[in-house]
Amino acid sequence: MMDRRRLIALFGGATAAWPLQLRAQQPGRTYRIGALALLPRDSPAYVALFDGLRRQGFVERQNLTIDPRGFGLHVEQFSDVAAQLVKAQVEVILPVGDAAIRAAQQATATIPILAIADDMLGAGLITSLAHPGGTTTGISILATELDGKRQQLLIELIPGVRRIAALVDSNTKAAGQLEALGDAARARGIELSLHRVAEPDEIVGAIDAAQAAGASGLNVLSSPLLGSQRQLIIERAAVLRLPAIYQWPEAAEEGGLAGYGPRLVQVWRDEMARQLVKLLQGVKPADLPVQQPTKFELVLNLKTARTMGLTIPEAMLDRAEKVIE
């Protein structure tokens, strides 16, 4: 691999690493948190989060209890598990995605909610970024804007492309967002087909349908569902030799053709952990601004490109922060 540029800190003012020390904790107290997500407990996101908490002095089985029931869920389980977490008196609930956030908000009006989602303000989950109000704060990852940017990059990655597809989580994407992608594609003379999924077992069929529709490239739109099934998508795209671009740069390091966005590990290890620690220390969520990523990375995988018979334009290679040979 070669780094084309030095990766800058992901969030303005966020610290990349902290000393291993306790910070404003009550001696002898154990803190209890609970997730509400499609992601499994061993996903890179949670591994990064727990590492960030450890760096801040919050260590599982020492002074931190992580309720096990909220990992690896299906959407229809969110409401029941949210109610269980409230009954268990967790001190913070950590939902991922709009549906999980709404379930947590409906379950409690008092327990702090630290969330990560595509567009928390646009979805009506908070009242403002600077002053979110209520019990919910967290990270809004600019998904709508980044989905459009990834579509643009995908078109530039495939010389002469005339037709592309988008893999869509039907639980999260609004019609207006998808219309904007279609308008942007048509403005460049590109035909865009949409392939919706609501459950993991629909993903392979949707990717197959995209290729059958004549798509020469696939834009994997941001969503908790598609993020949790990233390896499945990478593997299916490889079998079909279908170039695809993903929400997180790490996807290209795992065998995908391209990834563009903020670093998943840094979002969770640095910013999510920092905000969670503040909530555990007693800061009110209404007073904790919702954060947005400010630094993004393009990673390209030349090995994957070669297996797909794709020659990436030199101009694209020059733009990438990292190229995997």
Where are these regions (language model features)?
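Short hydrophobic alpha-helices and adjacent helix-cap/hinge residues
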Residues: 1-325
